[in-house]
């Protein structure tokens, strides 16, 4: 089943709060503290300077984001120069200041697994991502996102044990730098809400939470199997969610995203007391990237206004 069929089917279907401290203050007004950010994949579809005729230069990203109406931007490790240096980081910080945008979340992953069963590989991954925590701090981010449990190579409970160790260590390090660590549902075990809940409850660090992705629910490959209801998945994770990836691809003539019911999703997210960022992630190709980003942002703003 492809993503569109899966989400259309799931849309017909449709919490115990762990010891997580607030990024937001509890409020009777839904989404009072929510900030809408843009994720770089919306505008840049290749990494490390790869060929992307419709893309932009990563250092122009803050100004372009501002021109599209954003005050907050996410960063992606693969969009920075492959040989990153202090000058590059300083240039990005300066360009953010010039554009009057703030950094929200640094997205990392794909260069090692902090929950690897092999201790040498796990330690190497942790060292790599601690380096990126330092960069997130220099960029002025509130949080860094990482992935864990994406690839199924060992049994469910065994993977959880190593994931707890890795997330605790990286979370402790992020906390020492004043950052939150967010683990995303990014396929594999991480797309099983119960596995993620077990991970959060066992890690139990004040600065560790979840980045909830609207569409990443692939449990296994060949054949593809999915967590059956993305809305229920977000609902189960909502006590731990501090940011979401608001995915979009195609829109109806009335401006509704055609694969995700945004109003239903944000109704559920009213139960997420720590939600601070909604990151616009447009991946479509039938309209311009700028238009897709603007439609997604407008849709989020519309449903939030309706829910208030």
What would you call each of these model-derived segments?
Residues 101, 179, 272-276:
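A short helix->loop->beta-strand "cap" motif at the edges of active sites that frequently abuts
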Residues 136-156, 177-186:
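Active-site groove signature of glycoside hydrolases
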Residues 42-44, 77-79, 109-112, 148-152, ...:
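Active-site-proximal loop/turn and secondary-structure-junction residues that shape catalytic pockets
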Residues 72-73, 168-268:
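Acidic/histidine-rich catalytic cores of soluble enzymes
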Residues 2-138, 157-158, 165, 175, ...:
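N-terminal pre-domain/capping segments
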Residues 246-254, 277-287:
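Active-site clefts of carbohydrate-active enzymes
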Residues 240-242, 274-278:
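A short pocket-lining beta-strand/turn micro-motif at the edge of beta-sheets
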């Amino acid at each position: 089943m492809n993503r569109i069929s899966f989400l259309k089917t799931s849309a017909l279907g449709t919490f115990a709060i762990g010891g997580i401290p607030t990024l937001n203050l509890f409020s009777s007004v839904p989404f009072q503290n929510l900030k809408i950010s843009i994720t770089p994949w919306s505008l840049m579809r290749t990494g490390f300077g790869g060929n992307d005729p419709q893309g932009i230069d990563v250092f122009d990203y803050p100004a372009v984001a501002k021109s599209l109406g954003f005050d907050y931007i996410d960063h992606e490790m693969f969009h920075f120069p492959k040989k990153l240096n202090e000058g590059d980081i300083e240039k990005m910080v300066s360009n953010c200041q010039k554009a009057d945008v703030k950094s929200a979340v640094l997205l990392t992953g794909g260069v090692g697994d902090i929950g690897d069963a092999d201790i040498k590989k796990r330690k190497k991954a942790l060292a790599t991502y601690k380096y990126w925590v330092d960069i997130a701090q220099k960029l002025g981010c509130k949080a860094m996102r990482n992935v864990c449990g994406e690839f199924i190579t060992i049994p469910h409970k065994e993977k959880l044990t190593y994931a707890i160790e890795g997330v605790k260590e990286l979370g402790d390090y992020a906390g020492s730098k004043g950052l939150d660590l967010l683990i995303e549902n990014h396929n594999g075990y991480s797309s099983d809400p119960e596995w993620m809940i077990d991970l959060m409850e066992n890690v139990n660090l004040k600065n560790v939470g979840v980045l909830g992705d609207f569409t990443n629910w692939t449990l296994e490959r060949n054949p593809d199997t999915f967590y059956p209801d993305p809305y229920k998945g977000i609902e189960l994770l909502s006590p731990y969610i501090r940011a979401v990836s608001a995915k979009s691809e195609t829109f109806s003539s009335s401006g509704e995203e055609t694969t995700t019911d945004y109003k239903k999703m944000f109704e559920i997210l009213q139960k997420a007391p720590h939600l601070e960022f909604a990151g616009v992630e447009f991946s479509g190709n039938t309209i311009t990237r700028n238009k897709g980003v603007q439609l997604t942002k407008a849709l989020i703003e519309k449903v939030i206004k309706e829910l208030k």
